[in-house]
Amino acid sequence: SFACQSSEVLEQAESKADLIGGTVAGLLSLVGVVADPLRSPEHIVLSQILEKAWSEGEDLSLETLISRLVDPPFKKVGVFPLDTFYPSDKRMELAMRLNSVLASSSFALWAQGEPISPADLCTPKDGTVPVSIFYLAHLSDQERMFFVALLLEKLLAYTRTLSGTTALRSLLYFDEVAGYIPPTA
């Protein structure tokens, strides 16, 4: 789900923009769309849908997001009418691609279990430091990128809500980063 973030995150313009941008980029990568956050109608409209929902304190499911892509809760994007900026047939095409992911049997597993909560992942329970391991080898490249993007965006948003400390609170270890972080010369 695309759960509404805490007020601490949403009140910080940079944090909110980073979270929305990363979430939308991850979602679009899942359906093979490479989108420029400043120029791509797909990215801009999905970002506005998320921002509107979260500013109203609303959690969105993928189903709701797809429905709102077909019939967005706004009529203008910038100064242009929505249908001029991103025509309804193009929105429907993207909605169909997202719906195909939602309807696939392999994606059904994503809807099961507890939603990922960085607070739950990082907070000691009964004096024991939690260890969480995410095994992603069975996922396609697009699914891995989607999951990693959402996880890292949620972790970053969570850490921005915490006060400073001199003690280590958590450690993120990312093994086998090939394909995520390009090598440098």
Specify the residue positions occupied by each region the protein language model found.
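P-loop NTPase motor domains
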Residues: 1-185
